Amino acid sequence: MPIIIISSDSYETGREISKKIAKATEYNYVDREILAPIAEKFNLQKGQVIKALEETPSLFGLSAKLRNRLLACIEEATVGKLLGDNVVCHGLAAHLYVLGVSHLIKVRVLSDSKKLASQLSSEAGGSADKIETLLKRKVKKRKQWSLDAFGLDETDPSNYDMVINLSQIDQDEATKNIAGMTVYRKFQPITYSINCLKNKDLACRARVVLMEQFPDVKVRADGSTIVVEVKIKKRTKQKIAGVIKKLAGGVNGVEYVEVHAASDFR
Amino acid sequence: MEAKKLKIMVIDDENIVGKRLKPALEKSGDIVETFENGESALARFDEEPFDIVVTDIRMEKIDGIEILERVLAKSAHTKVIMITGYATVEIAREALSKGAFDFIAKPFKPADLRAIIKRASKELRA
C-alpha cells in the first residue's frame, strides 16, 4: 500500500491529523518516538536530537557536524520504518529526503493560524495577534532550515502531491480526502518504487557507518552496489578508498563499493 | 495438470534487450515474441492478443504509453509491464494510472522481470 508523509507548518496540527489518517487507513503511525535510540547512541537528550530537525547549526546550538550526523541517523531510522509499508509518517522531515518514490504520497497541511493563535493565547496568555506573528516567523525559520539541511524549500507546494488548508476545510474532511488518496492506482507500490526505497535504505545505512570517519560523505545505492563520494586528496586516495570499502562492505546488503573523489560538495 | 503456456510480447527498440530477455523468459516454458518497434508489435497484437506485454517506454513513433493504451483498449485482461532507462515518479504514476501492471527501471536482472511475470500470471490464472 502507499506510504503517507505529512508535513505541516505546525508540528501539533500535523501530528493530530496524521494520527487521524493512520486510524482511518489502519496504517502504522511513525513520528518522533523513533528518535529515542538515536539520542541514546549519541548520549543526548531526545530534545537535542529534535533540534537537528528544527534548527540550523549555530554557535550556541548544534554544530554543523553533529547536526549532519544526527540527520543522517534520523534518515536511516525513518527510511527503515517506511520499508515496512502501510505507514503514515510525520515529524521526521521524510518529505525532504525520500525523493523519487512513486508510492509515497506527500501532503502539506496548512494549519488555521488564526485559530491556532487564539488557542495558544488562551492556553498560555499573550495576545493572539502577537502569537500569530510568532507562528509566521516560525514558518520562515522552517523554510530556512529545510533549505540549509536538504536544499529543498518545504513551504513550496510543488514538492507535494496535495496541499490542504485547514482554514478552509475541517480536519475530519481533510483526513477523509488524504485517506482517500491511498486507493488511487498511481500511488500503489511498483517494482521501480520499491527498489528506489530499498536503494535509499541501503545508502542511508552505509552513510551512517561512513560518517563517523568521513563527515562529508555522500552515498547512493543501486541494488547491492553503493557509490561513495568523498573528499580525498590524491596522495591518500588509495588508502582512504580501502578504508571506505572495508567499512561499507560490512553493511548488510552491500556487495560492491565504488569510491569516487568528490568534486562538488554543497 | 500443466499450466497453460503464457504468450509474452517484448517490445524494445534496442534489439539486445529482446535477444537477452527471450531465452530468459522462455525458461519458464512460455511463448515469447520480440519486436523492435511499436508498429509491428501492435500489428501482431491485432492478429491475436497476448497475455503479457513487456514494453520499453521511450521509442520513436509509438511510445510505450501509447502501446499500453492501445493494448488495453483491445484486450483488457492483458498485463502490460513497462521498462525504461528514464524512470521518473511522473512517468511511473502516468503508466500506473493508465493501467500498467508494473513498472521497472533499466538495467534490471532477467530474474526481476521473471518475478513480475510470475505475479502477472498468477492474476491471469486466478
Predicted regions and their residues:
Chain A
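Glycine-rich phosphate-binding P-loop
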Residues: 4-21
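ATP-dependent small-molecule kinase phosphotransfer cores
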Residues: 35-86, 126
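Conserved phosphate-donor/acceptor-positioning beta-strand/loop module used by diverse small-molecule
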Residues: 100-123, 131, 135
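Small-molecule kinase domains that catalyze NTP-dependent phosphoryl transfer to phosphate-bearing small molecules
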Residues: 129-171, 198-202, 207-208, 216
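Short, structured interface segments
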Residues: 170-188
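N-proximal, solvent-exposed amphipathic alpha-helical segments enriched in charged/polar residues
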Residues: 188-217, 239, 243
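Short, non-transmembrane amphipathic alpha-helical segments
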Residues: 206, 235-259
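Short edge beta-strands and adjacent turn/loop segments
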Residues: 211-235
